[in-house]
């Protein structure tokens, strides 16, 4: 499998894909995540940060992931690096099927991701229901309005999306991405699709300095170059057909990719630089 994560002595992938076209990723699920202290009888105990790695190594489809979570593995509250990360997951496959996996105090839940979007807390059902608060959103501009007996002619575009939340909270990002995913013009091929998805993800990315942490906690040796802000370190797009993992970073908007099909015969793990230094293309001498 190919993915992004911190290796240390064991591989814990934040997200990735495998040779069968199964894709998975995890996101922060603060306050709501809860894991059992021990495994169910007859199941494998699994620390939450290793779920993506385990599923990509053993499953070929979303259906197999769901079945494994129900029958083969238990997510248990065993600390990793001194803590149990509060996380939840999303898995998709080549059929277009997608699920959200959330472990709460009342048990493990697997939801079919019909909206096609996932952010952070609260849980997926809450975010989906919250869309009912935005029935007015549409891509079509509103026409003339009557006020005080006068007709006011529109003088700008975008009025159909008036009320679309623009802050960086997870509920607002969910609504924003759900609207964009529903109405954005789909790409005609993989290159166009990848470019479109990065444009959509950019609308939900955290600019450095816009979201200051209220309680960053104790700084540990693992916090290299830590800053007191929440920001989008990287954005990624995965393609199940080409088995490509595309990404760009906060400081470098040049899109890079790794193609898993060209690495399948390898016999050792590989790491690739994120490419965080800015790159600019000088075309001064190319004018005609």
Question: Where would I find each of the regions flagged by the language model?
Answer:
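Short, small-residue-biased leader/transition segments that mark boundaries at the very start
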Residues: 3-8
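Structured, non-membrane catalytic/scaffold regions adjacent to prosthetic-group chemistry
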Residues: 9-117, 122
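N-terminal domain-start signal
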Residues: 1-2, 27
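C-terminus-biased signal that marks the final domain/tail of proteins
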Residues: 79, 85, 94, 116-288
């Amino acid at each position: 499998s190919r993915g992004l994560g911190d290796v240390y002595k064991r591989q814990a992938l934040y997200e990735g894909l495998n040779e069968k076209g199964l894709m998975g990723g995890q996101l922060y699920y603060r306050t709501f995540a809860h894991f059992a202290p021990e495994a169910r009888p007859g199941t494998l105990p699994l620390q939450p940060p290793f779920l993506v790695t385990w599923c990509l190594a053993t499953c070929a489809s979303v259906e197999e992931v769901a079945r494994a979570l129900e029958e083969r593995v238990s997510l248990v509250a065993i600390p990793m690096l001194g803590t149990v990360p509060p996380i939840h997951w999303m898995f998709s496959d080549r059929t277009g099927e997608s699920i959200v996996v959330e472990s709460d105090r009342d048990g493990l839940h697997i939801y079919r991701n019909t909206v096609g979007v996932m952010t952070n807390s609260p849980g997926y059902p809450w975010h989906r229901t919250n869309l009912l608060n935005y029935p007015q959103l549409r891509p079509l501009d509103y026409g003339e309005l009557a006020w005080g007996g006068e007709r006011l002619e529109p003088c700008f575009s975008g009025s159909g999306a008036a009320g679309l939340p623009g802050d960086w909270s997870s509920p607002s990002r969910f609504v924003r991405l759900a609207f964009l995913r529903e109405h954005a013009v789909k790409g005609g091929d993989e290159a166009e699709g990848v470019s479109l998805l990065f444009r959509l993800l950019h609308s939900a990315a955290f600019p450095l300095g816009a979201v200051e942490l209220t309680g960053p906690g104790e700084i540990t040796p693992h916090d290299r170059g830590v800053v007191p802000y929440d920001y989008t370190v990287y954005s990624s797009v995965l393609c199940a057909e080409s088995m490509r993992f595309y990404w760009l970073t906060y400081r470098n908007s040049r899109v890079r990719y790794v193609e898993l099909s060209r690495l399948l015969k390898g016999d050792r793990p590989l790491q690739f630089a994120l490419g965080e230094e800015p790159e600019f293309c000088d075309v001064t001498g190319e004018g005609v």
